[in-house]
Amino acid sequence: MMERITARKNPLLQQVRKLVSSRKERENSGLFVADGTKLLTEAVKWWPGLETVLLSDGVEADVPEHVRVVTVPKDVMESISPMQTPQGALFLCRLPE
């Protein structure tokens, strides 16, 4: 089941912003952020630590049922993505041990 987030101050979106901007936050939480539909496809195939996927409106992805999937408006995706031109798929993964 997909969730929908529209508020920029949502705790998940605030966490994503911190992970993007702070190495210390990534180390403390054990998570990292990646961006891109092709990279997401590879993460689904090969990365067991895939936890949460954020998708822009209109972007679809085939992810396992145990992975949290959240849709957001395009402007919200642009506000949290580390990329200048986001591809519409942002995801959180566990750092390797």
Can you say where each PLM-predicted feature lies in the sequence?
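Arg/Lys-rich RNA-binding interfaces used to dock onto structured RNA substrates
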Residues: 1-97
